[in-house]
Amino acid sequence: MATHKAEAQETDFRTTGPPTDLEQCPFPPSSRKFPFESVAADSTEGWAVAAEHHLKRSGEDGGWEQPASGVEPSRPTTMASSKTVCDAQPHSMPSCGLSADTQTRATSKLPVKSKDAEMLRHLHTGGLEPDVTKVTKPRRENGQGKAAETASRRNIRSSYKPLSKQKPEEDLKDKNELLEAVNKQLHQKLTETQGELKDLTQKVELLEKFQDNCLAILESKGLNSGQETQESKQEPSTDPTDSMLLLETLKDELKLFNETAKKQMEELQALKVKLKLKEKERIQFLEQQTLGKDEASDFTIILEEMEQLLEM
């Protein structure tokens, strides 16, 4: 089976007919070789010889060598592949420049290598490692530069505020300041009104007490103000003149009551002053009394001592 496969592979890599002997023809003046063309021709000859040796070894071993894991195997060449290899040579170099054996080898047994296999072999040898690093480094640098540019743009956008937005913000700040000032003034007014309410409540309490005292005085004199008020409520006055007279009389009575109350208050204040003076006098008298008692006790002691001296 191995020999049959080898023969089948050889038939795949052969061309249609055997090579023919070509006459040696001189190069025309237009087909002179440049240095890079001679290097390309030498490289094609080297590839052809290496391919022939590889095919011989694979035929002796009984088949193709299995490629390593991760490397794609090169596909067997066909008639089209052999033509592509021949076309890969430089056009300026004629076919008569090479020997017949090398041309037949190149056209018959040169396998076309896939791009993936060449790239993997080149990577395995370590040829593209610096190139890859050279390519990745600028990409990373470009990525970092772009990120920095985007960040700077975002910061600029966030910091920049157009005039149309700044004006309403300033207006809002001014309005807030005015509202704070108004709130402070309102708090002050509230505190003042609360103090005034306390004062008014105290005054109302005093007036109620004064009213109670007045009613008590009227009752003591034989006037029932409560009954009179109830009767006046039950029997409403028909004539406005009577009501006016009653009001005038009430006003006169109130005036008199106020005058009497003022007089009594003055008398009370005078009595209070007298009481204070009498209290002061009493305190002074008590002090003098204590001093007299102390002096009397001292005199008694002195007299007793004198009596004792006389008896001696």
UniProtKB/Swiss-Prot annotation:
Keyword vocabulary terms for this entry: Cell cycle, Cell division, Centromere, Chromosome, Coiled coil, Cytoplasm, Cytoskeleton, Kinetochore, Microtubule, Mitosis, Nucleus
GO cellular component: centriolar satellite; cytoplasm; kinetochore; microtubule organizing center; microtubule plus-end; mitotic spindle; nucleus; plasma membrane
Highest taxon above the source species: Eukaryota
Coiled-coil regions listed in the entry: 169-210, 246-288
Interaction with SPAG5: annotated span: 156-312
Keyword Nucleus part of the UniProt annotation: yes
Record's compositionally biased regions (Basic and acidic residues): 1-13, 131-143, 166-176
Molecular function terms, GO-annotated: microtubule plus-end binding; protein homodimerization activity
Record region (Disordered): 1-32, 55-176, 221-242
Subcellular location: Nucleus; Chromosome, Centromere, Kinetochore; Cytoplasm, Cytoskeleton, Spindle pole; Cytoplasm, Cytoskeleton, Microtubule organizing center
Biological process terms in GO annotation: cell division; cell migration; cellular response to epidermal growth factor stimulus; chromosome segregation; microtubule cytoskeleton organization; mitotic sister chromatid segregation; regulation of attachment of spindle microtubules to kinetochore; spindle organization
Composition bias, Polar residues: 75-84
Matching PANTHER family: SMALL KINETOCHORE-ASSOCIATED PROTEIN
Function: Essential component of the mitotic spindle required for faithful chromosome segregation and progression into anaphase. Promotes the metaphase-to-anaphase transition and is required for chromosome alignment, normal timing of sister chromatid segregation, and maintenance of spindle pole architecture. The astrin (SPAG5)-kinastrin (SKAP) complex promotes stable microtubule-kinetochore attachments.
Quaternary state and interactors: Part of an astrin (SPAG5)-kinastrin (SKAP) complex containing KNSTRN, SPAG5, PLK1, DYNLL1 and SGO2. Interacts with SPAG5. Directly binds to microtubules, although at relatively low affinity. Interacts with CENPE; this interaction greatly favors microtubule-binding. Interacts with DSN1/MIS13; leading to localization to kinetochores. Interacts with MAPRE1/EB1; leading to localization to the microtubule plus ends. Interacts with PRPF19. Interacts with DYNLL1. Interacts with MAP4.
Free-text domain note: The coiled coil regions mediate binding to kinetochores.
Protein's name in the database: Small kinetochore-associated protein
The organism's taxonomic lineage, starting at the top: Eukaryota, Metazoa, Chordata, Craniata, Vertebrata
Name of the encoding gene: Knstrn
